[in-house]
Amino acid sequence: MKFNPTRLEIFKNLFHSVAEEMGAALRRAAFSPNIKERRDYSCAVFDGAGKALAMGDHMPVHLGSMPMSVAAAVAALKLGPGDVALLNDPYAGGTHLPDLTMVMPVYTPAASLPAFYVANRAHHADIGGAQAGSMGLAREIYQEGLRIPPVKLLERGQLVGDLMSLILANVRTGREREGDLTAQIAACRIGERRLIGMVAKYGRGEVGAYGRHLLDYSANMMSLALATIPEGVYRGEDLLDDDGITDNPQRIAVTIRIRRRKAEVDFTGSAPQCAGSVNAVAAITESAVFYVFRCLLDEQVPATSGLMRPIRVVAPAGTIVNARLPAAVAGGNVETSQRIVDTLLRALSRAIPSRIPAASQGTMNNLTFGGTDTRRGNAPFAYYETIAGGTGAGPGCGGADATHSHMTNTLNTPVEVLEHVYPVRVQRYAIRRASGGRGRFRGGDGIVREIKMLVPTQVGVLSDRRKIPPYGLSGGSPGAVGRNEIVEPARDTRAARQKGVPGRRLASKCNFHAPAGTVIRIETPGGGGWGAVESKTREKKKKKASKRNRVEAFQG
């Protein structure tokens, strides 16, 4: 079949539209605000060999690791027509336990093997474990929730009821989980239907051929992007504040070797896996690498598995970037992934300084809470959210305020929805002024968010950048560190709020019981600044002098 670049563009957009429509269906059918409002989900399309052909414009931390989930499901199960695999095991293709992934084969008529796979991943607000929200402090993965290896949730199109019952018996909010899981099944079926329709219209041969062309095109574009980076060895390192169990900083180190249009990304020198939950599995580390190098390309280049062909990732086993069972990993997905990105960008800033921004907030500021709602007949509830912060400034532009960045791509939960669904009141939601780092271009400001618990509640905070600030680049100052506080019920008065009463400081990672009336205050970090402030002052003086000279020349 003769290659046609116009047809390539058509098929690129067709595959992408399938992933996007899957996401729209999942969002509309979901029960939980975390999926319906915050859009904490991702969808993708894969070829029959498990290579990603298209990814929705969803969550980078999900998408870059999803090929491993598909590979794990295909290796563990014989997936026939109508089957849907479910998994969340970080040590078998998953990321952390709240992220439940579904994988469905797509069989075209009369085919004996799948032509495609469709997959989606969604963060469930609770999947059991010791703490409501399944993101609490832990030393082992067994404390974090229900661990699901690749299993069939649907077989020949029929729900495996015993498995669903087992899952719902181990979570706090069974009705919500059932609704979200059903929405994920619907998203898979939408993807299957669209791909079968595509094959019916264009033929399996042409659709398959252009799928392979997309992989090759992505690989070639990544090779060209690597060719723009000077050959050499570039190193970077950064630290997590602690692991939640000890106060010891956790080191992430990377060496990037660029040679002959290829890159080796080596994390040798990173800290050993730690006692707490900020361990990342290999899928998370590869996902962060995928994201950073994808950012070097034009946005029109398709996000496929081909992008990783010229890139080799070395993540030593038993370290914080490739933890072994039974390490706890809930924070590795949300916090360590962000620090890996910061470390990679710092290394690349030594190679291509004019293209790399300063560090963004570097944390997702995860907040979980749960309990029983006495206003609604003691109905159980569990909620999860991440809170935005400042992004790093870059060459030629300041950072954005109050924005999710890098490995997350979620929205916020509207205050009206949050207060309607859960027994809480949002007392303050504002930009944290002057928290961005100073520089020729200033880092973005973070957020101040205050939530009052109206019933006794179990609360968890999983955050970072509370001790070590987001770095600036090219002479820019770091952004402000974040801060977590609790205001006891007796101190939360109108007069105290007007005076800005300080709260009791919380650790970056903690779990606690909050009596009714307790206020949780989260102040998120600002982004780092870029460029020295002095250069900005000199530039203003030059502009004034130039203007004065032009006026004098005109008058003369």
Regions found by a protein language model. Give the residues of each.
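Glycine/proline-enriched, intrinsically flexible loops and inter-domain linkers
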Residues: 1-109, 114-264, 268-556
